[in-house]
Amino acid sequence: MATLFTATVPSHHRFVSPSQHPKQSLLSQSLSVTFTENPQPTAVVTLQEQQLTDWITSPVTRRFGIGAGFTWAGFLAFGVVSEQMKKSRLDVFQEEDNTRGLEKQEEIILPNGIRYYDLQVGSGATPSSGYLVVFDVKGQVHGTEQVFVDTFGGKGKSLAMVMDSRPYSKGLCQGIEHVLRSMKAGGKRRVIIPPSLGFGDRNVEFGQGLEIPPSATLDYIIEVDTVYCFQTIV
């Protein structure tokens, strides 16, 4: 099942990949977990593994709430995700200094039909498969004023999504994930997504009168706030 949950994230947080935590010595060691199909009574996690799990879970819990923290604890404890934080760290203030807005927006057309305009170029990490991305998004049907999702300006909570985790929700689609792969933390982009990478020929209803008609072209504004980088344990 996909992992998509809402998050309230301070605007100054851009890239999180800590290296100076008291538990940092644990990050260079492999995570070995014993589990079965029924993990509750049989899963075994050593004290050292529990410390590593707590270290990753704590900041996620603070940013995304208890449920998200439990989700990551479950990933680590039960082998759903066998990953750990990278040890490198990019200073937040330096990253924000290097983020720059663009006076002139150039249209980029991708082979798959996606068009986008960079409004602000970020200087942080670029999300990859399995990475946790926190971003704000506004989506509407192209050529109309019909907005179906908007988390900017306190209108809603920022979204947090694990890359390559489906199905999508909250008005997101395959085209959004494709675009995120070439963005950096701090970046902002307007994206126009064709129906083939949106919701296709389906009529999608979100409740409260919000819906996307069949074969709709979608117009999004995306701003990447934070990228949590994880390094696969081999």
Curated annotation (Swiss-Prot):
Identify the PROSITE patterns for this entry.
FKBP_PPIASE (PS50059)
Query: Which reaction does this enzyme catalyse, per its entry?
Result: [protein]-peptidylproline (omega=180) = [protein]-peptidylproline (omega=0)
* Single Gene Ontology MF annotation: peptidyl-prolyl cis-trans isomerase activity
Keyword list, A-Z: Chloroplast, Isomerase, Plastid, Rotamase, Thylakoid, Transit peptide
Task: Tell me its EC number(s), please.
Answer: 5.2.1.8
Entry's SUPFAM superfamilies? FKBP-like
Transit peptide feature, positions? 1-28
Task: Please list the residue ranges annotated as the PPIase FKBP-type domain.
Answer: 130-228
Q: Per the annotation, which location comes first and is thus the protein's main one?
A: plastid
Q: Name one Pfam family in it.
A: FKBP_C
Q: Where in the cell is it found?
A: Plastid, Chloroplast thylakoid lumen
Q: Which GO terms describe its cellular component?
A: chloroplast thylakoid lumen
Domain of life (superkingdom): Eukaryota
What functional role does this protein have? Answer: PPIases accelerate the folding of proteins. It catalyzes the cis-trans isomerization of proline imidic peptide bonds in oligopeptides.
State the similarity comment: Belongs to the FKBP-type PPIase family.
UniProt-recorded name of the protein:
Peptidyl-prolyl cis-trans isomerase FKBP17-3, chloroplastic
Q: What is the lineage of its organism?
A: Eukaryota, Viridiplantae, Streptophyta, Embryophyta, Tracheophyta
The gene behind this protein is FKBP17-3
